[in-house]
């Protein structure tokens, strides 16, 4: 599980579609699809229900959305703390 996969997953969840997330992140549709599929394979469960042009989160996807947001927020805080210590 990589931070970039989590970032893409969150974008798809927030945008409600792979296409919209890809546009927002300036990546290809296949990049977003592969990232979410890799997470699903690693976790052994579906994270999103894919409809014609939209997606909805499964219960597992809702858990991942909540926890991934925490992880990425903490990673950003860590980065800022380290950068601040170097500037001193």
Predicted regions and their residues:
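Helix-turn-helix DNA-binding elements, focusing on the entry/boundary residues of the two helices
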Residues: 17-18, 36, 50
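Short helix-boundary/capping micro-motifs
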Residues: 11-28
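Alpha-helical residues within the helix-turn-helix
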Residues: 23-24, 41, 62
């Amino acid at each position: 599980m990589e931070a970039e996969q989590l970032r893409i997953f969150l974008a798809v969840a927030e945008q409600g579609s792979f296409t919209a997330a890809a546009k927002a992140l300036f990546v290809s549709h296949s990049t977003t699809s592969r990232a979410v599929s890799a997470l699903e394979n690693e976790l052994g469960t579906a994270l999103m229900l894919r409809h014609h042009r939209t997606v909805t989160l499964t219960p597992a996807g809702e858990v991942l959305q909540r926890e991934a947001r925490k992880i990425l927020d903490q990673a950003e805080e860590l980065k800022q703390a380290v950068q601040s210590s170097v500037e001193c």
